[in-house]
Amino acid sequence: MQDNVIIDTSIFTNPNIYKSISLEQPIDAIEAFIGLTHKSSKKIYMPRTVYIELCKVVDLESIKSRFESSIIIKSPNRCNITINALALFDFVEDMRIRINKGLRIAEEFARDKTQDIQNTISKLREKYKEALRQGTLDSKEDVDVILLALELNGVILSGDEGINSWADKFGIRTVNPLFIQEFLSF
């Protein structure tokens, strides 16, 4: 049986991951990944929203045709995928908790008059982002990875904590992206 593998940008933009493919820059890792896909029996997919995001982060112009010939750019069929109501309930509850935590962080920083404003804003942004986004689905691109994996009964290859956490909730198989080369060679 051939695996359908769904990838996201993290395997090309997270230095800890892309350096397991190529020790150079993200574009070099993408080129090496393309080479791996040609030797693999697996079908590699990337949701269109993720592809658009990747193109904003990495200049793919020099390898765009090879990329699009090697990786299937496909949006999930959002109209025909059914999501378990409990998952939606859990997501809303998780977001409520995160928003409340974010408000507490903002209040804490608003009360702290001892730091300079630039330093305070920088620390606030970091803590707020961690509270609201880390470990959850925080973008439409993340949701598309999950939906496409559900649609294709696929395996997710991602370094995104939120994607991997929600993949686990949906019973979607994930592979540690640090093992990309080994995974694609089987």
UniProtKB/Swiss-Prot annotation:
Q: Which family does it belong to?
A: Belongs to the HARP family.
| UniProt-listed Enzyme Commission number(s) | 3.1.26.5
For this UniProt record, the keywords arranged alphabetically read as follows: Endonuclease, Hydrolase, Nuclease, tRNA processing
- Is this entry keyworded Transit peptide? no
A GO BP term here is: tRNA 5'-leader removal
Q: What class of enzyme is it?
A: hydrolase
Q: GO MF annotations for this entry? A: ribonuclease P activity
What name does UniProt use for this protein?
RNA-free ribonuclease P
Q: What does this protein do?
A: RNA-free RNase P that catalyzes the removal of the 5'-leader sequence from pre-tRNA to produce the mature 5'-terminus.
